[in-house]
Amino acid sequence: MSNLEIVTGAGPVGSAVALQLAEQGINVRLLTRSGSGPEHPLIDRRRVDVSDSEALRSVSEGATAIYHCIHAAYNAADWERELPAAEKVALDAAASIGAVVVFPESLYAYNSDTLMTESDRRNATGGKRGVRTALLRAREASATPTVSVVASDFFGPRVRTAHAGERMVPKVMAGKKIRVIGSADQPHSFTYIPDLAAAMIAAAHNPELWNSVIHAPTGPALTQRKIAEAFARAAGASPAKVGVLPAWVLDAVGKINTDSRELAEMNYQFTKPFVMDSSASEVLLGLSPTPLDQAAEETVVWWRAEQARTAAA
């Protein structure tokens, strides 16, 4: 059996997947336009345009799995223009070499006001949510085996552009006040990115889970205030000072600012409970979520190392 697996993209998800695969002794070919990504003896970083079907097929020859971890700018127009075509290239390449494709997925396509489970309908429409629905349907219709691994908002090493990323963690570490969107005290699920990566790998290696949608192991729902407090504890910082940017403000600014409008589309996730349940998938995967205090500590350790690296540059 081949000992080669492909990862497209070296963002937080792709990097976490590549490192975990390498740590398991698997040869990884990490594909990006720039040849970037984490360093490891078993990670072969390649400059490849993964939107080029022939280039992706050629470099993936002999692989048993493709982890498709690329994305697009955070707006619906770019998602609709770029993501379906990019996923089709990955699916076609995998079909030609007999590989499974594993996708990280969000909760955007879910259309539930209650606890979100693997059995929920994923049929949201409009904007970015509608794009995610269309992508899930295309995967389901493909003859190529796929697994979509759903996570809530990320946090963890290398996570920057997220609600619990650079807008929160380094500020809390420094004892500064943060402002969160919607509400600081509504229950909200947060997924630790190494747990998502572990779930993607486990799913790829278990054919019984192919052609399904599963949930990454995700701990009990927190609130934005509670996760900020966890980072403060891990950093030995003063208690987190948390303010709120009301949803209506983001809505108003979104009328004149594109970036704010794209964020405002997701206000519903932070003005009422937004909670996923991963218990069924945890049984199937044989995995459980990393305890919050451990995950927060590992996140703070990464940020401290990153700050030291930046200061020394």
Where are these regions (language model features)?
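SDR active-site strand-loop-helix element
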Residues: 31, 69-70, 101-106, 149-151
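N-terminal Rossmann NAD(P)H-binding glycine-rich loop of SDR-like oxidoreductase domains
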Residues: 4-24
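Conserved Rossmann-fold NAD(P)-dependent oxidoreductase catalytic core, especially the SDR/UDP-sugar
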Residues: 85-131, 147
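Conserved beta-loop-beta element that borders a ligand/cofactor-binding pocket
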Residues: 106, 137-159
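Mid/C-terminal beta-alpha module of Rossmann-like enzyme folds, strongest
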Residues: 2, 11, 200-262, 278, ...
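Short-chain dehydrogenase/reductase
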Residues: 80-84, 121-140, 162-166, 189-190, ...
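Substrate-positioning beta->alpha
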Residues: 160-167, 181-205, 211-215
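NAD(P)H-binding glycine-rich loop region in Rossmannoid oxidoreductase-like domains
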Residues: 36-97
